[in-house]
Amino acid sequence: MNYKDSGVDIDAGNAFVSRLKEKLPGIGGFNGLYPIPTGYERPVLVSGTDGVGTKINVCKVFNQWDTIGIDLVAMCVNDVITCGAKPLYFLDYISTGKISPICDQIMEGVLKGCELAGIDLIGGETAEHPRHAPPPAYGDDIELAGFSTGVVEKTEIIDGRHIRSGDKILSLIHI
């Protein structure tokens, strides 16, 4: 059995990656490369991964898919910054029954999310699984996950040991 016999459209996958390469010429390999940041005495890398879960249902209702890409980046980056790390880069994972324009819309959001977070998208994976999931009429079969890495000076890690009753909590919102 080959890819075509299993229902995987290699040409659609290659076209999808080509569209992404127009915006990100460095992607497309089997890994993402990122230079080690300078200016740290004892740098610690911090990583976080997350998925969008049932938020996909909101996209289905409104037929708007770019916002879920922004949200995916934000959730991963938010996990990384909780310890004081500066986010550096992001990788995405899309699993779907069929590569469709929905995937392009999601990636537009991922790119926007990376721009808003001030980080680079250095790679990812788009997996087409036609025998395991129906085509994405409304994205029913789409699963999204992301992974982000940041860096923090070892002596500046926020780990909660110094949080005390009465401390002020600040909340910021970007409008």
PLM feature spans:
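Conserved small/polar residues in nucleotide/adenosyl-binding loops
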Residues: 173-175
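N-terminal small/glycine-rich loop or linker at the start of catalytic domains
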Residues: 42-62
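Short, structured beta-strand/loop micro-motifs enriched in basic residues and often containing a Trp
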Residues: 147-154
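N-terminal amphipathic/basic leader segments beginning at the initiator methionine
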Residues: 1-26
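A glycine-rich phosphate/pyrophosphate-binding beta-strand-loop-alpha-helix module
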Residues: 63-143
